[in-house]
Amino acid sequence: MTVRTMARTGAIGLVAAAVAVTAFTAPAQADSGSGAPKSQRHQGVQQAMDDLVKAGIPGVIAQLRTGDRVWNGTSGVADLQTGKPRRADERYRIASITKTFVATVLLDQEADGLLSLDDTVEHWLPGVVQGNGNDGRKITVRQLLDHTSGLFEYMGDPGYRKKFFTKEYLQSRYETWTPLQTVKVGLAHQPDFAPGARHQYSNTGYVLAGMIIEKASGNSYAHEVRKRILKPLGMRNTTLPGNSVTMPNPHSKAYSALSDDPNTTEYFDVTEQNGSQAFADGDIISTTGDVNRFFRALLGGRLLPAEQLKAMKTMHPNAGPVAGYTEYGLGLYSYRTSCGVKVWGHSGGASGALSETVATEDGRRTLSVNVNADWNWSPAIVESAFCGAKAAKAGKTGPIAR
């Protein structure tokens, strides 16, 4: 997302202390890509998770995978009322991490000859992108994926924000939305800049990307994700919710501040949400293990031909307003950690959930993290995973990609 700041501190009284659980699975393998021993990384990640809970987040889960060695960590609670601890295999809304799946599908469709990334939006969706200075004849599929289309971010619309980012959301979260309905919110505004002028994060473009997936294949967007990614990789814990409002089990509660006030201490259970409100810009539900499996396969060259993977990793400088990464390609961003390790991945923010998955360039080491709240995030988790326990301290960041 663009405008909503997701960094917020403030204690939640019902979380008196962290509930920390760690687990190791699979045999040890040779390590690569970091100057920190495994034990330091695991201890550092767990400490960063515990610190985030102490700072007021209900609960955190993470999985760090290096080769065939898997470490799972949890901290805090899944339910503020019962005190039930979080568990490592919980499903959560991965939000904008969905964008990496969407870009992968479109690139795979290109490899199959179904479309070209240089096709215009007008070619696939005639008459959809027009009015208020918007022109689908001048925007390519590639520009949707790398956020250089210039299309207005629909989540920045004042009416939309009132409906979905305030207490009104307690009712509106049950509404079913069509992709076209969502796109029209963005198209009611003039574009922010001419197509191709710069990178600027826009969910509007990814809704259109999902619509193009359907036009090019004759199948639903969900069908294409399952066909090209989930089934080949055996991702049995990953689902596309459609217009369902419920979460598959096991899952934690999702807590939202529903306010831009950084001093608020009032939080709401928003676990139930109509999945249609996100679509291809952020609807997927998954687990840390499944998302790690996806990024490992993607960056390891198992999902896309070399030409398409190279295109995905061709980066543009981040012009904002979303913080947290320095470059963005096609549904994939990158940045360097404090110790110089370059990581590739994506973050996601939904009401009641913040998540990130990052990996080394070859996908050998992958980290997936989820917090069941939307008001604070810690860069220390990633820093510790790739640089060691003393790399960073838990604290605030800017807006996370929504």
Which residues does each PLM region occupy?
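N-terminal carbohydrate-binding/catalytic regions of secreted carbohydrate-active enzymes
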Residues: 53, 64-85, 92-93, 100
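Hydrophobic (often cysteine-bearing) scaffold residues that line and stabilize catalytic clefts
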Residues: 41, 45, 94, 98, ...
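Residue-level preference for non-acidic, small/hydrophobic
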Residues: 49, 68, 99-102, 106, ...
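Short active-site loop at a secondary-structure junction
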Residues: 58, 82-143, 193-202, 279
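Short, surface-exposed loop or secondary-structure junction motifs
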Residues: 133-343
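Catalytic loop of the DD-peptidase/beta-lactamase superfamily, centered on the K-T-G motif
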Residues: 2-5, 27-74, 266-402
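Secretory targeting and sorting signals
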Residues: 1-31
